[in-house]
Each structure stands twice: as structure tokens, then as C-alpha cells.
């Protein structure tokens, strides 16, 4: 995909029909910034927001309340969480979310634009994190350092539905090898270096937090 927004949008549209309800947290990038799937002229989906707890993690009790009271087509999570200062959702919470969604027969999509930052920070393997979601989008053009591109990982059968939505959104690209090559290099060589990326973010937050007219949101 040329962008993470298009990757998320294609996946969500592949799960849902117009008018269906999608669970997102109240500060999620898909909900506050991307918005495509909730646009009345495009996605036509209805957002249902769940709360974050005091640690900026998905509130399981609020999730259960919504799932018990409404018909939900898809549950979306974000890891790391952009607007919460890059909060990492630990595997224990992801497992609990997955089990809760499975109880109600609801698939889980993860906006993992900076997933590998979370993987490095938590000291886990990407495969461990991804086993608790049905699909995940991640960017290779952020901390990983590639010039452009995002990927969606899911089952082979579901990927065909996503490709159809990508085509409708104008995302099919020709001669894409020139951007695939640096992405492959990034995934092979740059994941461990995200520890530097995380440290730089924490350092920047520490230096900025006491400046006048500057606010650092959450624990970076």
C-alpha cells in the first residue's frame, strides 16, 4: 500500500458493510485522523468508541459493555498508540482483547503503523503479537526507514478481499519493485535499531515537557 491510511481503510472495508458498527478507542488514529471508513460518502460505517484506562490501554470492561449491548462488526486496536505518546499494548492485554472479541464472534484489526517499535520495546517477536489479531497493518516508512509503503498481513483468503478494496481506492501500483526493495531491506536490517528510535523519542519528550506552551501527552 502507498500509505498506512489506505492499508487500514482497505482492511476495514473488507470486513464490513455500509452501516455496520466498528469499535475504536476515543483517541485512535483511525477515528481521529484517518476517518475514511466513517465518512458518509465513502465507508459509511458507524464508529462506537471504547475508553482507554489510566495507563492509556484499552479498557476491557468498557469493551465488554459495548459488545454485550450492540452488534459490532469489527474491533480495532492500535499498537503503538500514536496519540497516547506511543503507548505499547502488552501481550497480556492483547490476548485478553482477542479472547473477549472471540467470545462475541468479532474479528480484530490492529493499526500497527509502529508495531515494530512496540515489538522492540516489549522484547517480543512480531509473530507473538500478531497471533492475537486477525489482521494487522504496519508501515515500513516510519522508524524502519524505507521511503514509502505499508503492508497488511492477514490470511491468504482475506487478502484477496483487501486487494479488491485497494483497487477501488486507487492503490494498485505498477513497477513497485523500486519501493519494495528498500522495504525488504528495512525489515531485514532495521528492526533492532528501533531501540534507538524509542530512546530518541523518550529523550525528546523529556527535553520538551517543561517548555512553555508545550505539552507531552502520555508516557513516551
Regions found by a protein language model. Name each.
Residues 2-220:
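Conserved PLP-enzyme active-site core in the AAT-like
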Amino acid at each position: 500500500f502507498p500509505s498506512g491510511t489506505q492499508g487500514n481503510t482497505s482492511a476495514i472495508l473488507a470486513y464490513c458493510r455500509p452501516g455496520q458498527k466498528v469499535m475504536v478507542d476515543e483517541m485512535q488514529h483511525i477515528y481521529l485522523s484517518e476517518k475514511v471508513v466513517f465518512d458518509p460518502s465513502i465507508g459509511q460505517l458507524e464508529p462506537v468508541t471504547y475508553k482507554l484506562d489510566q495507563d492509556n490501554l484499552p479498557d476491557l470492561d468498557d469493551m465488554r459493555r459495548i459488545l454485550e449491548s450492540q452488534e459490532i462488526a469489527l474491533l480495532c486496536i492500535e499498537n503503538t498508540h500514536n496519540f497516547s505518546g506511543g503507548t505499547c499494548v502488552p501481550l497480556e492485554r492483547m490476548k485478553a482483547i482477542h479472547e473477549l472479541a472471540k467470545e462475541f464472534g468479532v474479528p480484530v484489526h490492529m493499526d500497527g503503523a509502529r508495531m515494530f517499535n512496540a515489538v522492540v520495546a516489549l522484547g517480543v517477536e512480531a509473530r507473538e503479537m500478531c497471533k492475537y489479531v486477525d489482521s494487522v497493518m504496519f508501515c515500513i516508512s516510519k522508524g524502519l526507514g524505507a521511503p514509502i509503503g505499508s503492508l497488511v498481513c492477514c490470511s491468504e483468503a482475506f487478502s484477496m478481499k483487501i486487494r479488491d478494496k485497494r483497487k477501488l481506492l486507487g492503490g494498485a501500483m505498477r513497477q513497485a519493485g523500486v519501493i519494495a526493495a528498500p522495504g525488504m531491506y528495512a525489515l531485514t536490517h532495521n528492526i533492532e535499531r528501533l531501540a534507538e528510535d524509542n530512546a530518541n523519542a523518550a529523550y525528546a519528550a523529556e527535553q520538551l515537557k517543561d517548555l512553555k506552551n508545550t505539552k507531552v501527552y502520555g508516557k513516551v
